[in-house]
C-alpha cells in the first residue's frame, strides 16, 4: 500500500535511515558472515557493533542465531534491535534462505522483539523456478522492514529505492530523511517503467546472459580450482567460493 512505502536514494539510504532511527551508539546489529560489504560502513558510521552469524547451504544459520541470543540473555546482554540479511541470492554468498528458516527467523524476531531488515535487492533476479515468500510477506507487519532498489534491476546510476514497513516506522524514517528528496525525474522514469511492466521484461532479457556468466564462472572454478567449495546460485549476481 502507498502508506507503507518510503522512497529513498537506493537501498543504502534505506539501511542508513533504519540505523539512525533504531540504533543508539555502541548497540549491536546482527549480520550474516559474510555480509554485504557496503552495508558495513553504514553500520560503522552509526557506531554499531556486530554480532556475526554463520551461513550454510540453507542461508543464515538460525540454530546458531538462537544459541547466540540465548547466550547473550544468560550473560545479561541486551537483545540486538536489528538483524540485517539478504535472504534471496545473498550478496556475496549467493545463498537463499530456506522457507523453514524464514519462518523460524520470523518467529525469533517476534519472540525476542528485534526487527529484521530484509534486503530484497536481488529477489527478482531469479534464473528458474518459483520464488519463496519474502520475510515481510510471512510477517504480521510488525517485525520486518524491507529495503529495495532499482539499481541492480535496471541501472547502477538509477538511485531509486524504497523501504516497505508499517506507517509508524516509516514516519520515524521520513523524519530523518533530510536530503531534499529523491530526484522527481528519476522517480517518474521508474514509475513509468514499473507501470508498463518493464522490470519483468528487462529481467527476462538479462537472465540468460547472467546464467551464461554464472555457468562460465563455475566451470572456471571447477577446472582451475577443483578443490574449491562453490555456491551455485539460482539467481542474483554472486558465486561464492571457499578454498
Where do the protein language model's features map onto the residues?
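Conserved core segment of the aminotransferase class I/II
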Residues: 140-208
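Conserved glycine-rich beta-strand-loop-beta hairpin in the small C-terminal domain of fold type I
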Residues: 208-218, 228-242
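Conserved core of the PLP fold type I
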Residues: 1-112, 123-141
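Surface-exposed helix-capping loop/turn segments at secondary-structure junctions
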Residues: 1, 201, 221-231
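Feature representing long, continuous alpha-helical segments
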Residues: 63, 103, 171, 187-188, ...
